[in-house]
A protein has these predicted regions:
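Non-catalytic signal-transmission and effector/linker regions of two-component phosphorelay proteins
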Residues: 1-4
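Active-site residues of response regulator receiver
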Residues: 9, 55
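Two-component/phosphorelay signaling modules centered on CheY-like receiver
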Residues: 12-32
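Acidic, metal-coordinating helix/loop segments flanking the phosphotransfer/catalytic sites
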Residues: 33-51
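Acidic catalytic/metal-coordinating carboxylates
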Residues: 36-39, 61-65
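Short amphipathic alpha-helix used as the core "switch/output" element in two-component signaling
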Residues: 42, 64-73
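Receiver (REC) domain active-site loop signature in two-component systems and cognate sites
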Residues: 58
Length: 73
């Protein structure tokens, strides 16, 4: 079984670091990378991932806002 994953962080190095660590797991597929909360919501709606690594402190639409928006869906 493949674990479809989305990485969300406004820091490119954080995304790269997560990506490098997750490559060690054959059953993890990174389906998208997002730089902000609004991109994340669109991506989650499109890809319907099993797992989302979500940065909480992002400018503008932060991680808490993403969680709130998804809870309202």
């Amino acid at each position: 079984m493949t674990i479809r994953t989305i990485l969300v962080d406004d820091e490119p190095l954080a995304i790269k670091g997560l990506e490098m660590r997750l490559q060690a797991f054959e059953d993890v597929e990174i389906v998208d990378r997002c730089a902000n909360g609004r991109e994340a919501i669109k991506s989650i709606k499109t890809h319907k991932p099993d797992l989302v690594f979500l940065d909480i402190q992002m400018p503008g639409f932060d991680g808490f806002s993403v969680i709130g928006a998804l809870a309202d869906m």
